[in-house]
Amino acid sequence: MTQKTTLVLLALAVITIFALVCVLLAGRSGDGGGLSQPLHCPSVLPSVQPRTHPSQSQPFADLSPEELTAVMSFLTKHLGPGLVDAAQARPSDNCVFSVELQLPAKAAALAHLDRGGPPPVREALAIIFFGGQPKPNVSELVVGPLPHPSYMRDVTVERHGGPLPYYRRPVLDREYQDIEEMIFHRELPQASGLLHHCCFYKHQGQNLLTMTTAPRGLQSGDRATWFGLYYNLSGAGFYPHPIGLELLIDHKALDPALWTIQKVFYQGRYYESLTQLEDQFEAGLVNVVLVPNNGTGGSWSLKSSVPPGPAPPLQFHPQGPRFSVQGSQVSSSLWAFSFGLGAFSGPRIFDIRFQGERVAYEISVQEAIALYGGNSPASMSTCYVDGSFGIGKYSTPLIRGVDCPYLATYVDWHFLLESQAPKTLRDAFCVFEQNQGLPLRRHHSDFYSHYFGGVVGTVLVVRSVSTLLNYDYIWDMVFHPNGAIEVKFHATGYISSAFFFGAGEKFGNRVGAHTLGTVHTHSAHFKVDLDVAGLKNWAWAEDMAFVPTIVPWQPEYQMQRLQVTRKLLETEEEAAFPLGGATPRYLYLASNHSNKWGHRRGYRIQILSFAGKPLPQESPIEKAFTWGRYHLAVTQRKEEEPSSSSIFNQNDPWTPTVNFTDFISNETIAGEDLVAWVTAGFLHIPHAEDIPNTVTAGNSVGFFLRPYNFFDEDPSFHSADSIYFREGQDATACEVNPLACLSQTATCAPEIPAFSHGGFAYRDN
């Protein structure tokens, strides 16, 4: 080969390499050589834009900041100059405790929703503490019309039969602050010697903190609370770190200077005062167990000890979200409803429609309780009635990617509680559609005919989370493509604990050197106002029975034949099923309209719960949550029975403001507007794996509302998410199988928003 030929070939090679480089660079972006950005997924599904929402659902929207401000201004003007900001109010002051939506009457709402009538007047319910009156009391005022109020109406006597005693009021944050001031500045210094010896006591107890219990006393009129003391661990839960000291504080007096310690409990023994405890310690009569301050490391911390790994799976919408959220309204191709948050009762949804037909007027959380046992006074007497604290009030910002899918839609909540101005809880709700990774239904046939058919199991979810002291409750409303609704709550957070001594293992398991995880039950109560093909419904119970039967074709033999039993439940007493008793496996509400096959159109209530035993009725506090006696109860719907509990039941359980058994008065439930009241819960015996805190796995309960002959066939038969192909068809072809198109339809990249957090001190905003 000549030198000239070699040079020509070399030049051609250089040109070829240059051309290849140009081709490669053509696929790169001009932003510094990085790979070209993939196509971003649409944020709105083009085929359903804009999505329509039933504007009639506005009656159920929680109050806006403007409405809350207008109500507060009206109350300030009309209640006089003596009104004090609740954030600073002492027991002897007048203050506005809360302002929230007054739900409209159902008849007025339906007249608007279904018959085009005027929208119900929007009103607010304000709870006022009148501590400065000659006879202190609590009053409930309805204020309206919004957004420009011109009247307020005292409904206390109308709703409760008389004035509400002042001692029933929930405890304000300021009252807790004054109790802590009393404990740490006035009382604990009296036992400083003991506390230095046992618990690394610092000036005014800066390394310690308190946790409240409830109820507060032993009879109506009491306001005496056991407070447990714990190590204050920065960045970690203090709940598993009791020091063994518990104080019974009498804080009934309107003047905090008159509050006293009634009793002291320390590491297994009772004392009359901290002074007596200190004197006996100095005399060598107290057997002190030294409790180390474990700090925030090791298994007590929620901070992982390992570095982050590969990113977990991420769900996204390749062709845009298939639902929309506008204010408090959610709609998809199948479902439409309005959602909200009761400041005390918690999450709720209204006007729930499937394929345009209402199946329920209201599904809402009513109450939650946690009932404890133990051998210390605080643990043995604790029964938290969470509505008094505020299931909505103590909702928390949802953490993107942990509490909800990262790409969920997040919605704020506005509230006015213990303040003179509205505040906002960022990301209080999330709404998302999720592929459950489980088919809704499927069948693969290899017999006679060869085919596959199935429906992708997707659900639409609305979620909120409440952190009530140590526990976090995750509340889910889940909407399935076959018309079923699933309602459930998951418990996580920290266990409550007590100092371990004596026969502590009768009341739980030891989870630390000096820590007893105390046994307890969780129960939640739900209101289910089903409107099955109309307002007039009937309650039916169905079950199974084995009946001895002569074999028809061989009479000398007998068989046990399985058959269905059916019973119409005609009264409230018949439809009240005690917890732990026999409950029909199928209980459903039905209309007098039939499906194509002649069966009454119905919705079944299927409860998934493993609740502990109810508190015996001999207990003097049991009347405060008598709904816990029942697995399920069906009653006539009445406007004067809006809720199964009251925020005033916690601090006077002996004479409860609302007693659920009053709802069960043996009235007829045949052909009436009915409400089903559902209890779901579980027993929790804490164990080592509850440290650092409790997991949701296995700690979830709730119920399903399932179509029962409501349709002529499964409505998901018409789902656009259906997959079907037969032998001989090309299952890899798009026109046969939509999943075969994913390589084309799902090759976009989701818009990943920057991580954000709603903050920790939102109540101080």
Curated annotation (Swiss-Prot):
Residues bound to Cu(2+): 520, 522, 684
Per UniProt, Ca(2+) 2 binds at 572, 641, 663, 667
2',4',5'-topaquinone occurs at which residues? Answer: 471
Asked if the Swiss-Prot or TrEMBL record annotates the protein with the keyword Transmembrane, the reply is yes
Provide this UniProt record's keywords sorted from A to Z.
Answer: Calcium, Cell adhesion, Cell membrane, Copper, Disulfide bond, Glycoprotein, Membrane, Metal-binding, Oxidoreductase, Signal-anchor, TPQ, Transmembrane, Transmembrane helix
Which intervals of the chain form a coiled coil? none
The task this protein performs is described as: Catalyzes the oxidative deamination of primary amines to the corresponding aldehydes with the concomitant production of hydrogen peroxide and ammonia. Has a preference for the primary monoamines methylamine and benzylamine. Could also act on 2-phenylethylamine but much less efficiently. At endothelial cells surface can also function as a cell adhesion protein that participates in lymphocyte extravasation and recirculation by mediating the binding of lymphocytes to peripheral lymph node vascular endothelial cells in an L-selectin-independent fashion.
Tell me what this protein is called: Amine oxidase [copper-containing] 3
Species for this entry: Mus musculus (Mouse)
User: What gene does this protein come from?
Assistant: Aoc3
